[in-house]
Design a protein with these regions (language model features):
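A common structural junction motif
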Residues: 52, 100-106
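Short, flexible helix/strand-to-coil boundary loops that buttress conserved ligand/catalytic motifs
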Residues: 45, 96, 105-109
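Short S/T/G/P-rich N-terminal loop/turn motif that feeds into the first structured element of a domain
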Residues: 5-80, 86-94, 121-154
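Conserved short beta-strand edge segments in small beta-sheet-based binding/regulatory domains
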Residues: 60, 105-122
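Short cationic/low-complexity microdomains
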Residues: 94-100
Length: 154
């Protein structure tokens, strides 16, 4: 029984793709789902910050995880949505599939799960031409090389 449960959980985690080169096309990693253990999740977030992995990969949070307003629907009280911007898909993958994240950081929020999250990655769209002068560019001013991040062994 234990083997079946473990196999089902492992099957939901995508196998790491071959490392890529950063193409300077920013992506947004969306973490969404109910949080069950807020203090443990905050400790996990602090460990990510202290690890320096986001700094090395040019990643940063775009929002606080709790809404300030709800315009439609009734989200559960414990719903968390967090958006993390990376300079490219290669660096988002370097983070997710790194030995540091998979072997050290991610286990801090598992067994039992501090929350039930879906983690997806989307391409960032450019600012509309008519608005570009008013809001400026979201471009990165230096390169972040995710290829130096040690990959988890799977």
């Amino acid at each position: 029984m234990f083997e079946l449960i473990f196999a089902a959980i492992a099957a939901t985690i995508a196998a790491p793709p071959a490392p890529r080169v950063c193409d300077d096309k920013p992506v947004l990693m969306i973490v969404n789902g109910p949080t069950h253990d807020g203090p443990r999740l905050r400790a996990y977030a602090e460990r990510i910050a202290k690890s320096g992995i986001y700094d090395r990969l040019g990643a940063y949070y775009l929002n606080a995880p709790r809404p300030v307003a709800t315009f439609e629907g009734s989200p559960p009280a414990n719903l968390t949505t967090l958006v993390v911007r990376f300079p490219c898909l290669a660096n988002a993958e370097a983070f997710w599939y790194s030995a540091l994240y998979q072997d050290v950081l991610r286990p801090l929020r598992l067994n039992p799960a501090a929350g039930d999250y879906v983690v997806t990655v989307y391409p960032e769209v450019p600012v509309r031409a008519g608005l570009a002068k008013a809001v400026g560019s979201n471009g990165y001013r230096r390169r972040f090389d995710g290829s130096r991040e040690t990959r988890a062994k799977r």
